[in-house]
UniProtKB/Swiss-Prot annotation:
Keyword Zinc among record annotations: yes
Biological processes, Gene Ontology terms: cell-substrate junction assembly; fibroblast migration
Phosphoserine: modified positions: 509, 535, 549, 604, 792, 867, 930, 935, 952, 1054, 1062, 1118, 1122, 1279, 1331, 1346, 1423, 1448, 1463, 1468, 1535, 1547, 1554, 1599, 1741
Subcellular location: Cell surface; Cell junction, Focal adhesion; Cytoplasm, Cytoskeleton
Keywords, in A-Z order: Actin-binding, Cell junction, Cytoplasm, Cytoskeleton, Glycoprotein, Hydrolase, Metal-binding, Phosphoprotein, Protein phosphatase, SH2 domain, Zinc, Zinc-finger
Lineage of the organism: Eukaryota, Metazoa, Chordata, Craniata, Vertebrata
SUPFAM superfamilies for the chain: (Phosphotyrosine protein) phosphatases II, C2 domain (Calcium/lipid-binding domain, CaLB), Cysteine-rich domain, PH domain-like, SH2 domain
UniProt-listed Enzyme Commission number(s): 3.1.3.-
Protein name per UniProt: Tensin-1
Amino acid sequence: MGCTVSLVCCEALEPLPSCGPQPPGTPPGPARPERCEPGGAAPDPRRRLLLQPEDLEAPKTHHFKVKAFKKVKPCGICRQAITREGCVCKVCSFSCHRKCQAKVAAPCVPPSSHELVPITTETVPKNVVDVGEGDCRVGSSPKNLEEGGSMRVSPSIQPQPQSQPTSLSRNTSVSRAMEDSCELDLVYVTERIIAVSFPSTANEENFRSNLREVAQMLKSKHGGNYLLFNLSEQRPDITKLHAKVLEFGWPDLHTPALEKICSVCKAMDTWLNADPHNVVVLHNKGNRGRIGVVIAAYLHYSNISASADQALDRFAMKRFYEDKIVPIGQPSQRRYVHYFSGLLSGSIKMNNKPLFLHHVIMHGIPNFESKGGCRPFLRIYQAMQPVYTSGIYNIPGDSQASICITIEPGLLLKGDILLKCYHKKFRSPARDVIFRVQFHTCAIHDLGVVFGKEDLDEAFKDDRFPDYGKVEFVFSYGPEKIQGMEHLENGPSVSVDYNTSDPLIRWDSYDNFSGHREDGMEEVVGHTQGPLDGSLYAKVKKKDSLNGSSGPVTTARPALSATPNHVEHTLSVSSDSGNSTASTKTDKTDEPVSGATTAPAALSPQEKKELDRLLSGFGVDREKQGAMYRAQQLRSHPGGGPTVPSPGRHIVPAQVHVNGGALASERETDILDDELPIQDGQSGGSMGTLSSLDGVTNTSESGYPETLSPLTNGLDKPYSTEPVLNGGGYPYEAANRVIPVHSSHSAPIRPSYSAQEGLAGYQREGPHPAWSQQVTSAHCGCDPSGLFRSQSFPDVEPQLPQAPTRGGSSREAVQRGLNSWQQQQPHPPPRQQERSPLQSLARSKPSPQLSAETPVAALPEFPRAASQQEIEQSIETLNMLMLDLEPASAAAPLHKSQSVPGAWPGASPLSSQPLLGSSRQSHPLTQSRSGYIPSGHSLGTPELVSSGRPYSPYDYQLHPAGSNQSFHPKSPASSTFLPSPHSSAGPQEPPASLPGLIAQPQLPPKETTSDPSRTPEEEPLNLEGLVAHRVAGVQARERQPAEPPGPLRRRAASDGQYENQSPEATSPRSPGVRSPVQCVSPELALTIALNPGGRPKEPHLHSYKEAFEEMEGTSPSSPPHSVARSPPGLAKTPLSALGLKPHNPADILLHPTGVARRLIQPEEDEGEEVTKPPEEPRSYVESVARTAVAGPRAQDVEPKSFSAPAAHAYGHETPLRNGTPGGSFVSPSPLSTSSPILSADSTSVGSFPSVVSSDQGPRTPFQPMLDSSIRSGSLGQPSPAALSYQSSSPVPVGGSSYNSPDYSLQPFSSSPESQGQPQYSAASVHMVPGSPQARHRTVGTNTPPSPGFGRRAVNPTMAAPGSPSLSHRQVMGPSGPGFHGNVVSGHPASAATTPGSPSLGRHPVGSHQVPGLHSSVVTTPGSPSLGRHPGAHQGNLASSLHSNAVISPGSPSLGRHLGGSGSVVPGSPSLDRHAAYGGYSTPEDRRPTLSRQSSASGYQAPSTPSFPVSPAYYPGLSSPATSPSPDSAAFRQGSPTPALPEKRRMSVGDRAGSLPNYATINGKVSSSPVANGMASGSSTVSFSHTLPDFSKYSMPDNSPETRAKVKFVQDTSKYWYKPEISREQAIALLKDQEPGAFIIRDSHSFRGAYGLAMKVSSPPPTITQQGKKGDMTHELVRHFLIETGPRGVKLKGCPNEPNFGSLSALVYQHSVIPLALPCKLVIPSRDPTDESKDSSGPANSTTDLLKQGAACNVLFVNSVDMESLTGPQAISKATSETLAADPTPAATIVHFKVSAQGITLTDNQRKLFFRRHYPLNTVTFCDLDPQERKWMKTEGGAPAKLFGFVARKQGSTTDNACHLFAELDPNQPASAIVNFVSKVMLSAGQKR
């Protein structure tokens, strides 16, 4: 077996035979000569092993000589600095003072051969062809460089970190000796856990031989009962040799993402518990620290449910870890094990707040230069994506005691963070690693964090780093500069070089980790199997001279000049800003299984079935089976040639999956621009490089590249080959391009799948029908994950079965129904799109250079960086995972990883959030859980839509990967914005044909009609998993923009301690939060932020916080949420997406609107684009942009209106609809003709690939904007609208009415002036009506899209009617101040959702307005939900801004948080849940604390009305403005009031939900929020007055034609989807209905989930047994939770319930078969709210009000025991005691709800409690403080009245407690609350 020695045999205590200890039954391995001694032949191994340590440690005398030290060095004895003369050992270099020489006791240990070379030196290979972050292509450098640093000098020796530089401990020496001498080390850690480890320097031939022997041994001993976990880079030979392999690799010497640790443990536990004979094999090549991390983590994991019979196993694991791993492990690995242990045990609480890194202070200057000092620079990675690169600091020796690297504005960090500090050698193309540190923000609870030398990887064993040295990180909760930190400035001797264009600085090797190593297999095909990427010829791979790995040679893309474009590069001044160094993720090409390939026979059907059952809980998608499947397939076709030409490759972001291992990994790095694939031969250096693209590597949640193996191939030398290859052996050049790496047979693999998924994949994958679906080749599928895969695949893309991939159980449950369709479908579309489409769109904002490597087809898929959302999601997921990890929590032992962790109420704030948002969602929660789930997963599998696939609720179809989802827009308009960046190959990428449209591929071949239905992954909703939602909610709360940036900290001492000071009032986050990248201007940042693509994988995850933030304007005191949200990933948004034109700064037009996708303005404004004057540039980039803007702006851009370019792209002159000058269409702008935009005449949308091409033709001043908008907004990702909806009818582009004038909305401002002015039409995205394909996967073509799916569409775009849901990010406008509104220059931007669009997106980001701008959001009728959180960032903007959101009638919910003042057009059932309109129109906006609180808490209180302000209101309790019923008059035609706007988390009673708003005074409604559609109770803003005269515009709902076209045959969602109503309202509506009547609403307890309330014929037995008395009609209304996950939606807690692609699908299925419900659902034919209104009297009767209750936020001050005292005396006494207390108690914001049931307090932030309920019969008194004392400790310092209520203590009849509160919202005074409580109490007393 090649394994002759086990580490255990090194123990002196256990002299064992040469083969090491073998567990009982272990077959003797084949006899092989001992390798333990490098040269040796082999005396008795036992003796040699025992003696070796002694030999190594034999004491030897030092040979000291006196030396004058020029640079400071610490004394090895006293640790003090040696300043002048000292002694140094000539042998071991041990240094000490002369006086300390006598005290030296440590033996002299000469350095090993591997220590002769500096361990951390990295050099850039000489022949660097491409200058790029990770793109350094090596010509012939003989050295392999490792990011980790060591230079391997001897092939047989692997340097291992030493815990002590001078003396080796026994364990260390033994371990090193073993590692140096043994090729293979196989150890049975326990009887069922085997560790197989090879040194990274193992000879390749021997390594392969040993691999085979290990495989033989495992098969002979364990048969098929072993599962191999590959912890290092992927190798084809591993998957060929073993039937079951899960890829969990990560870079050597690094630590895996926390989520990956969770996934590994879950997978191990599931496998081991499935069968007592199952064993786990941990395979690792490189440092054994990786095995140690897994063993230690599993030790803690299994300890949770520890049992006595496992005690020995745990002891064995502990001993193995301590003896074999600790000596060689890295500090960060130990830190992560500690994190994992703490999170499991609860000792570490999850911190979901966003942390902004402002300063990195290095105390103690390392001596890396001969004269002392060093030249450090930092690179910061988030989820292994570079997000920041600092300048190079030149620090002379002895000049400084510390150095501070300042990042301004603060860099937003979230999730797994890796910070590497390098030393750039002087005049040498090399860099040394000074230190490396990894941490996870969830475990950071202090704003000052210090890591000592022993905590720093690399430095802990480096003498050059002073022993007293430490590194301090200074964080804050906002990007604004921290006050009081001026003393941190460096001295004059420190200079900074910002020339980050040097390839050495930008070089990043992590991109390649996920690639396959090709050196492991002989069966490598030398060419691709046909022109898979759209090129005419197959690409021949030629051996790379350097390492022999082959890589396709591509001439399609000119080599970039070695000299970077400085304009672009300088952008990265002190940050990666993603523009400069963010590297896009490596695209993985997922190769579909060849169409005809037969399923590998590796596993029998029974085995597969069993495995599937076991692993189903993991959420392993079939797509994910990739690796395993691949292995099997490889086995079937060893030659690697597919039996059938491989259908097409899916580019899986971040990882190249090559089944045959035929290709080295390729990666597309967005490093600056070098790596951009060049479009049409244009140089890729433009600013809009991919790097900016959101699409940085998709990192799976785990934070590593998403692919199966999260990191680069070669990680075994994580970096060793950095410079040389992409890890995959491709020269970087090739790597840049997305090269379709096809190995002949690659199973479609999701880039990274969770282990579970992988497991599940095994069986699932099995016998799929040949997947040969046609896909439009070269589509840039915009997968929800936001990656645009440039898919140049053959026409056929394999599709994975579309089963409701839920777990085995759910699948089985639905199997009946599914079988038929599954059989019908050639292959179910992979659920590639874990991310919500929007996300994907945003994410994939293609850079202008989207062009694929080949001009034609392969659009580079834009790798996405982990978007902020994704990262947040990943954190949320992590949180959920931690909760879910507890073995007990799993519903079934085997399904611990069940897709959605239960959303049990008490779980944790996180638990209430749905899984990570869309972004990861594409994969089942589990996936996310697994940590692998790459956001790009979805990408991994092509989103193929079988062209003929029938709609099926279960049919989770992704858009064809190739098809541009965004293109799918049916309407030109949408396409216009949507040109998908990826479709760089433009012509070839015809959008998948729209449902109604026949796609006219601009390029002939490869066009495929994509089925309108999307895979669930695509749905934003689906994408959002419960966990994500729960987590997000929590995060959202925590990171509410309104929340003050955080107390300012003054550093009290240098140790990094800070004193908290009260935050300055209103220190808004920088309006445009630039992405952490400094270079980006606020506008850019906003754009980026809005632009999901800008974020690293921000899919839908969209953490709730973000969603909230988006929804709620951030308060002035807090930075705009957009800012907060903008993840570092922003840096990754392609500049082009921002509208920056590559190469020519002058051309760069910064699109202030930030929403790259401008909404198409109503027709009148169609041709015009509005621009807004930019703020003062904050960075070079911004200034450049500004400059560019200035020029163009000055000019009359009218002609270049956005729409024009679109039109031009086709060369058609589009008629302007409202008299917009035809001239507006200019010559083809960057939108290339190939862009898929619909031509005026044609119904099909052409591919938009080149739309963005920056070089294509002169840009008109506006064009850049257009491009940017397109790019960022919809380009790469078809505009959400467009994408989301493949509508059957085209939408006018830019408002131009192409073929469907009816759909285009009339521009809001038809005024000539607007036309005359250069307005960028905000590219309103019209959702084409009736496009079922919208992101929601709907049940059938005719079924209405599920209302809630596009939960987060950004509101700036208009959704065309019928578009089920706008992808969440797609529609987003820029979020954050500065980009408000799509309109710039004061022109209103209109965002309209056309009728019928069930849901625009959950959080349409409201149009953010800049002061003075008007943005109007119009949702057309029938759109059930515009978006949950249209970012209402404008809340922060000056109040002068007005954003008009008009929801047209019938739109059930505009967006949960429509931003901007929005008028709800009558009929719209619900305006955005948290629309924040106007300046700080809502209390939350005004009070940061409120919004913070609300957003911070994941709990969204039910939308109960606020308290009536004046008693006058009580008599009738009827206020014209308030209407409990969703369809109250407010929604009737003509009524400006919105229907049931979603409450804004109850904060401040601004729930403008359907509940009455009591903010009215004396019954007089003054623009009550309800009336206004504002979420706030304030009556200051009336939407109507901000809207232009609507009579001038043709509102979509006013057009009969439009209305007619918008109708869905079965769209009844408006009757049963009432997102805003509360549980009580649902009961009131249903209690008198027939059994089967139901309503679905948005859950207030579990963010992102839905509540199903249905009437049943009889109450459950438990109710009758309890003998409850009273009105039983309420008990007949039962409530079910519908959770959302990557696979869609499903009833929670029902194992036999499948996942559905949309709410509509779930509803219609249950109307046919009840499944787990008590009875079938009865689809309503009319709105129940109408019926209730008909039958009930006045809408706001006193009874209704009391029944409904009222609520608002107040400050909870204290609870004081009163014994039996009550009445005013109790209130007075409690107040006196509280005010006299020392210290005075801190007040906490709580949600105070009063109803007929009693008083309920909810601590949204869960600081004191979760929820407390005081039944009405226990409340004895409520009143204000009789002495009218005030509470002074309020946020703003204004005194607040105190009030309280007295209630009996639980379980007592005499003892009382008085609960004191202070009013928080001026609109909800204490008197109103007290009056209402008294009224309720009085009413209850009368009843009794």
